[in-house]
């Protein structure tokens, strides 16, 4: 069945991202926030991080391609320390660039291999490799310890889907080969939830033996967890498998419901108690939004006009969760 949006989502805000000659976005690879500001990673053409205020106006950007300190060929991923606002930027050639919350360069850390995702926790820097579905933790002294590795799989890391998911003081991660959600601990990790879905066993077998593309990939698509929520001792999570779904724990069992947040063509990311997706301005329809989010507190775009619609600028769709 379908679960009412207002049982999961408290409010929705549509935030139009303004641009200027230096901060035009081609697309959004990830979104994070700190101290009322939004940080957007754009990997569509020339990798850069752009900082916006609460009104969607650009404040600063980090755009330093090159070979020197603080420079990069591309940005793979980034994460913000929620306590300090420091930004950990995963780059290629393999290194980590550390910025302050104003996007000023602090220092960089060289890496010995390529990684696909990064997250900061109090025990170090978490690094995920999609090549071997492994998680490494880098300590403050630069030493690296592998804390998770699963069986090899025909695995592709979707650049639009999160692997590390921050929820309160916990960090979770998902890797497709195990169809499980894990919680990072001080010493390693533990299974937080294992989930089921239609054609699960066949999908697992197919992914182990071949790279699925086209219609086959659609038929055997596996869930991508986007958001983790806690209600007391119960753990729930939102995932995407063709459509958005929510899996809710009740009396030790998980029950799946469709979640009607259609119209978002791009994967969502979690920051604080907010689940953030984005659309292009020409896809924004206030009437459709009012229908989809009926019963939810809705904050639409002020002074919406044809110029904004035709600009092609991204619009953040910010879901504040009712329980998190």
Where are each of the predicted segments found?
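Conserved blade-ending motifs and adjacent loop-strand segments that build the rim/top face
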Residues: 192-222, 248-280
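Short beta-strand elements that form the blades of beta-propeller/WD-repeat-like
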Residues: 37-42, 85-91, 124-130, 166-182, ...
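Short coil/turn segments at the loop-to-beta-strand junctions that recur within blades
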Residues: 21, 63-71, 110-116, 150-156, ...
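Asp-box/WD-like beta-propeller blade repeats and closely related beta-sheet repeat scaffolds
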Residues: 73-75, 90-134, 147-156
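Short loop/turn segments that connect beta-strands within beta-propeller blades
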Residues: 53-55, 100-104, 138-142, 184-188, ...
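A short helix->beta-strand "capping" segment at the edge of beta-propeller domains
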Residues: 2-26
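Blade-loop segments of beta-propeller domains
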Residues: 18-23, 27, 57-84
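Repeated scaffold domains used in trafficking and secretory/extracellular systems
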Residues: 27-30, 73-78, 113-121, 155-163, ...
């Amino acid at each position: 069945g379908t679960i009412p949006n207002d049982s999961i989502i408290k409010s929705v805000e549509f935030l139009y991202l303004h641009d200027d000659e230096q901060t035009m976005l081609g697309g959004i690879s990830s979104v994070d926030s700190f101290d009322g500001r939004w940080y957007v990673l754009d990997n569509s053409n020339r990798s850069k991080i752009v900082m916006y205020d609460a009104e969607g106006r650009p404040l600063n950007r980090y755009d330093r391609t090159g070979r020197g300190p603080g420079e990069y060929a591309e940005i793979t991923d980034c994460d913000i320390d929620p306590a300090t606002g420091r930004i950990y930027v995963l780059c290629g050639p393999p290194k980590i660039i550390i910025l302050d919350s104003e996007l000023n360069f602090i220092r960089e850390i060289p890496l010995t291999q390529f990684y696909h995702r990064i997250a900061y926790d109090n025990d170090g820097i978490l690094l995920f490799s999609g090549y071997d579905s492994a998680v490494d933790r880098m300590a403050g002294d630069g030493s690296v310890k592998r804390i998770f590795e699963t069986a090899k799989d025909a695995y592709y890391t979707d650049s639009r889907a999160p692997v590390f998911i921050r929820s309160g003081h916990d960090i979770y991660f998902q890797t497709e080969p195990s169809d499980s959600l894990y919680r990072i601990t001080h010493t390693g990790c533990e299974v937080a939830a294992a989930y089921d879905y239609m054609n699960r066993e066949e999908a697992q077998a197919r992914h182990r033996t071949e790279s699925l593309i086209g219609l086959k990939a659609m038929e055997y698509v596996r869930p991508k967890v986007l958001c983790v929520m806690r209600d007391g001792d119960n753990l729930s999570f939102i995932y995407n498998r063709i459509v958005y779904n929510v899996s809710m724990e009740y009396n030790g069992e998980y029950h799946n419901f469709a979640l009607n947040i259609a119209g978002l063509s791009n994967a969502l990311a979690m920051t604080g108690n907010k689940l953030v997706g984005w659309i292009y301005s020409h896809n924004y329809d206030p009437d459709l939004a009012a229908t989809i989010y009926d019963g939810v507190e809705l904050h639409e775009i002020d002074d919406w006009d044809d110029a904004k619609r035709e600009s092609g600028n991204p619009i953040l769709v910010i879901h504040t969760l009712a329980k998190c």
